[in-house]
Amino acid sequence: MGMIFVYTILSFPKIYMSVIEYKFEQYKTLGPIIYKKEKYKLQVELLKLQEDVIKNRRRIALCFEGRDTAGKSSTINFFSEHLRPSNFRYIHLGIPTKEEKNNWFQRWEKHLPEEGKIALFDRSWYTRALTEPTLGYCSKKHYEEFMNNVNRWEDKLISNGIEVVKFYFSIDKDQQKRRLSA
């Protein structure tokens, strides 16, 4: 039983990807004191990142994707808990309108971060490929258009100075079932 955590960092001129698999058993013995110390260290690093983003007028889009109950919202809450509210935005878009279905990337462009800001996306443009086809929110044509254009669109973001960090959270079906029934 475990959780798979994948992240990808897109920024000029490099693309970096890592896959980390966490086994829950490793963390069951983590006591509250050690947990608080580790959490504090991580939050200090997030504040340092935000200060650098502000100082250097960076634009960072953090995209959180994954299975339901895998921990996306909890992680976003952790990331943003001590950040300066004026320099980050939380974005969670619901079911797309008819116009948004036909102008998929424009739907997201209006929420991209400005200079000196961080945008935290609770789900991202990848819902077009990951969940919308199974929920009936997009046609095969929309799906294929997305798949044919997403890399070019992300290249445009990067060339415009936006750093994109994508996280994907996955848990096994048994763990997901337990969480949904809790």
Question: Which residues are covered by each model-predicted region?
Answer:
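Methionine residue identity
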Residues: M1-M3
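Glycine-rich phosphate-binding loop of ATP-dependent small-molecule kinases
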Residues: Y7-A182
